[in-house]
Amino acid sequence: MIIKKILSFTASIINLFIFIIILTFNSNAQENNFKYFSNDEGVLSIMYHRFNEFKYPSTNISMDIFKKHVELILDANLNFYHPKDFVNEFDIPKKEKKILLTVDDAFLSFYDNAWPYLEKNQIPFVLFVSTEPVGNKGYMNWEQIKEIERSAFGVIGHHSHSHDYLIDKSEEVFLDDIKLSNQIFKEKLGYVPTLFSYPFGEYSGFMRDYISRNFKIAFGQHSGIIDVNKNKFELPRFPINEKYGEIKRFKSIINYYPLEYKNLEPEEKKLSKENNPPKFKVRFFDEQKNIENINCYSNEGDKWMKSKIKLVEKELTIEFREPFLPRRGRINCSVNDDGKWRWFCTQFIIR
């Protein structure tokens, strides 16, 4: 009888332990459940679109400059992170900074120009595909996308169906768009990609919450460096184009490090008259040194200016002088931490 009770008690303990593990490591939780100062060296995600399409400077990069970017990364002894490893190891603090390469929209210029170079040098990347334009003029077709998928280092990501301004649409339209894209991915690839990129980097709380229940990771288009405490479904990337891909700037970007924080408010990134300007608050970890040196800049009133910040016991608040104007409001904060520049950005969509 005593032995049976001991065995029953032991089984209960094991079941409880398994339950706790499942709760702790649920990869589809909207945000990491446990926040701690990790001293993570970070993952720097960079985003490209077109290659050698000089008619579109806001989304284009020349191949010559792109190759120099890769050389700068390698010369800095930084390694490209395979997307699958990035997902599987997200909750592990990085002892060395890594680079995650992402490409949005599956333009034909990527396949014609960048893909042969990446294939030759076996550089891993994510290609985010919107299903509606596939096969149209200027876009890759499904056979070309499958060629990327068959490689050992190319991963296909989800970028909606229409690539529309979905944040402007009804919740029903957003859901229908994602579900239609899912059907097409299943038909063409046999599965639905688990990495997601919000079209134009825009999302509301509703969109983010839905994506968090159906994908493993999601990216915006706001700058910053990823660490284990960042929300898995609001991950930052540095957008690179002809203007913002200039070599001097790129050298600075790859030398940035994450600025970790416990909490950032507001969670809702879609602003209206009722909540614009937002009540912005960030709580940093007690272990973060030199946070008193932080500076923030914001484009409130459509004018970039130094923010009026208040820092009390590791909690930062910003007093905005004016509301943000459509379409995007941004706040960039950085701190010199004993020679390491730490950076994060928050983006709001203004309606």
Where are these regions (language model features)?
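Terminal accessory/targeting
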Residues: 1-96, 116-143, 239-351
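Metal-dependent polysaccharide deacetylase catalytic core of the NodB/CE4 family, i.e.
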Residues: 41-60, 76, 89-99, 108-113, ...
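Conserved beta-strand segments of alpha/beta enzyme cores
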Residues: 79, 155, 216-217
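Short, electropositive alpha-helical surface patch
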Residues: 176-178, 206-219
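Catalytic-core region of carbohydrate-active enzymes that cleave or remodel glycosidic bonds
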Residues: 188-191, 213-223
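A ligand-binding cleft/hinge motif common to bilobed small-molecule-binding domains
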Residues: 224-228
